[in-house]
Amino acid sequence: MTYLCADKSSFIQNHTNMDKGFNYYRIKTTWKGEATDGSLSKRKTEELVYASSYTEAEKVAHALIAGQQRDRFSDNFDIEIVKTKITTLLYSNILAKDEGLVAGLVCTYFTESEETGVGLYGVKVMFTALNEKNGEEKHTHEVIYTPATSNADASERIKKHLGDSIDFVVRDAKFDKAESILWPEDVYKQKASSDAA
């Protein structure tokens, strides 16, 4: 079923929590760590950080390495930092919160392993705008990210978030490998309070 919307751009501006100059950066780290059986093995993690620059994201990456002792068994680790195209990332109480700050940021994370299905999902949404002058439909797509317990739960969370304020179709939901999300304190508080509402 396709829904019609007269003004997607104003809706997205009101529902996108992106501050000017801030972006989500994906930090991929590879290091030698302890496996569950006690042996040393190559470990890989991915985190998302909401930062003002690549340099700030790099500082967070090094703070994560030091804080989680990822350099405990070897000084040889790899860091890859990529600016993402994520524009909207929702908060959910599925995320646990670290007591302390990491490089001045609030660290939220998933307590369950990805095998359970709990994690971050990118949900592709199609919006249909109706040109009032000629009556033609124009389709645009956006991927909205949300913590969820499954593909179906992610889709439902996006439907609830968008509500009746705009017409849309949820197309697809894909699991994202990010294990944690780091936000400035004010952004975290805003997201947590809007989730509670």
Predicted feature residues:
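Short, low-complexity cationic-aromatic patches
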Residues: 18-25, 50-56, 112-122, 137, ...
